[in-house]
Amino acid sequence: MPEYPTALGASSKDAITLLGHDLANDVMGEVGFGELAFWLATQRRPTPGETRVFEAVLAALADHGYTPTAIISRLAHLSAPDSVQGALAAGLLAGGSRFLGVTEDCGRFLHDVLEDAGALPTDDAGWDALALETVRRQREAKKFVPGLGHHVHKDGDPRTPRLMAIAAEEGITGPHLALFAAIGRVHPEVLGKTLPLNGAGVCGAALADLGLPLELLRAFALLARTAGLIGQLAEELRHPVANDIFLSVDLNNRPVDPDPYEPPPVGQDSL
């Protein structure tokens, strides 16, 4: 008979174990949800400091107002009010490279730079030099630096200094956060303007410094946003706006002449 080993949940007639512990007696009422999420992903119990940083990330990413993920969830619930799971899933599926995906993109970007750097800097001057080289390379390649800039918080994202402070208080400021902070200091020399380090980016740096799998960084952002979407749906039930959003489009659309698609000439980049 085939076997399917797992260190996660397992059940017998009289007990349920999770991560090798009795679920009812050792986990329920003893382990917070954020701590448990970290533990499930890494199969090691986080320290109190790691838990504090991780839960600060979850709080930072839970909700950011009427973003596309929130609007889509509300509209999906308007269309199918009998399917709360569909409304939640619709919002989560909207998480991507523009919204929520920056957490993963920034964590991976910083990690790749650090892997290529060899010996890591030991002081701010060294980090600034590495950051300057990194920003210049991105500029020459005509690429953005993930985590740099925000369409609303143009003068500074309040989540960024707070998360950096929490990580420092817990002794968890690692190379990813150090490089990200240095990028914030030196990028004006290359770009000629000052952009904020955004909250999604600093969350990616913090998650990477916690040693969490890079492949799951977006999953943690989605975990956080799940709570936010539940809040959006709860508010929609009491104070609905989705129908107004729908009607604002439905009542204000206007017919225009067709705009036939023309493929680009052969040899040019496709759309």
Give, region by region, the residue ranges found by the protein language model.
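Non-transmembrane, aqueous-exposed alpha-helical and coiled segments at domain scale
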Residues: 1-271
